[in-house]
Each structure stands twice: as structure tokens, then as C-alpha cells.
Amino acid sequence: MEQNKTEPYKIGVMMDMPGFPGASDMFGAAAQFALDEAFEIGLLDRPAVTIQVDHLGQPYGDGYHSRNAYRQLVEEDQVLAIAGPLTTDNSLAILEMVESMKVPAITICGTQDYVGKYAFNLSNGNLADEPHYIAAWLKSRGHKRIAVVRDYPSRIGMEFHRFFEYATQQFDLEIIGVGNVYPAPTEESMTEVLGRLKQTDPDALVYLGFGEACRELNNGLRNNDWWPERIMTSAFVQATYHEFFAELIDGWYGIDQFNERNTRFADMLKRYHQKTGRSLTPNSATSSFYDIGHCIAIALSRMEIATPEAVASALETIRLLPAVTGGPGTYITFGPHDHRGFKGLDYLNIRVSKNGGTELDSFEFSAG
């Protein structure tokens, strides 16, 4: 009698930011590679395949695009878990659906409000932690009086700013001016806002936002003939995607999670090249989705029955898993009431954009 054939496990990938070379084309490939490695070493009893749905999420489209993508992966493709979406806005747009449809979604969003029984997070940046990292860096450079340009109205810009206010209190800094720009500002509006901030004569400039404004930040500074020391949130990560984005924010420092000192990431990139003959871009887009794929693979290996609910329960058993994202001390731990996985003081770092590339800054976070 012929034995029944096993079906591969199906895992969804939500790509809500298509069109970013060095990122959009890395996420699915990195997640699939983690699943492939798990099968090859015998962690999984069968292959796992990714099904990717590209869609234009916020701030380019609206929340319906992400909701439709999640619904398609759950109802039509019947996946066991989902990697993505990427951004805070789109993750919050699907949160109620994630909780009602009970298919776990592991996002890389930074908000503190993506919370639920089936909502998991390996954040590529963090809207609460980043402001404290930035404030500590500013203090280490001897800065006191800080000007802020932020996305507004914007959930990301507003949450960043709220926690930056807390951080300035902790690190004894003063916000002396705040300028609001739309998440996708014009050169004219950026020039006007930065001109007003220049008049406050700050020690340094901070950008708090999603990152589409990076296309105009240096234009606005150039038009005002103003080049203060400046730092931004994890909007900076796009500088590691492609030379084009690095050149847009030349001279800026920013929060990132790509760290050359983490040899686990370098080893993973080498294995991928040896296996496929292709290369993954060394950045936190690649590393975070490999980590997501790795976590899903472990959960698939531990689930007691093959259902999305069982995958969610199995994710909560992951403890002290060394990450390829972040520095050497970064690890992943989940628990029943702890779905924000990255841990360790070096899960974030600061880099600077120079000459079409980026360099790791020597700053190390200290809470005092």
C-alpha cells in the first residue's frame, strides 16, 4: 500500500513596502532560507514554503491593502503563520484581524501597541527604545539643546516623539524646538520647517519618523546652509539597503541593527552564497527576516498539532535564541505575555552614512 504524501508547511510573507531594492527583495529570501536550513538539518519533518503577497501599504496606500493581504494568506492560502507586515501603521491595521482569525503574524514594526495573543514582534527598531538610545548618544557627544523635526500627523512620528520627551528627561536634555512635516514632505515644506528650527540655534538636530522624509532632509538643510550634527531613528536603515538611499542622508547618524561584529550574521550570509550562488544584502532587513524564519521553523518543530494556534503556543517556548540581527549579545526570547523577541543592550546600534555607505559608530549604550 502506498504511503500518503506529506504536504509542505505553508508560511505567509506580507510585503507592504515593495520597490525598495536591498530590502523588499531580501525579506522573503531570508525567511525561506531559514526554513530551508531547518529542514536540511532535520529540525523539520517536511519542507516549509513561503507564499508572498506584495501590496502597497501605508503610507503609500491605506490599511485595507494590508488587511486584504492578511485575509488572502489566511483564507485562500491557509498558512500556519505569517512573517510581516513591516511597518507600524500596517501592523496596527491588521491587529484586530490577527486576534480574531488566530493566525500569528510576526512583524518587524516598532510600536508598543502591536500586542496580542497572536501578535509577535522582532522589531527592526523600536519606537520606545530608539529615543532613549538617541538621547544617550546626544549626551555622550556633549549636546544639551535639541531641535526635533518629526512626521506629523503620523502614528510613528507621534509615538517616537512621546518617548523622546521621556528620554530627554532621563538624560537631562532640552527640546528647544519642534518642526512638523508630513510623512512625505515636499522640499519646500522641509526647507521652511528646518529654517525655523535653525533660528533656535540648537546643539543638534533629531529626525523622528518613518523615513520617507529622508528624501528631503538634506535638501532642506542645504537650502538653509545649515549642517548641525544630526541623528535619526531607524528610518536610517534604508541607507544600508542601497547606495541611493545612503547618499540621500549623507552625514546623518541613525539607529540601525546591522552590526559587523555579529559573526552569526556573516556566517549566515556565507552559507546562503555557498548554497545558492547568490548574495543577500548585509543589512537588518535580511537579518530580521532570517530571524523570523528561524523562529517560525522552531515553532513548527515544537507544535503539538499543525494549526496556527499551536504555532503561536510553540513560539512562546523560544528562549535565549542567538540572533543574527543586532550585536553579538542580541538574543530572542518569547513567553506567554512577552511577544517582543529581541533582547540585549546591543540589539540596537548607531551608524553613520558616508559616501554612499554606512559605518558602525563606536557608541555603546549606557542607561546613566
Task: Give residue spans per PLM region.
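Extracytosolic ligand-binding ectodomains
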Residues: 1-368
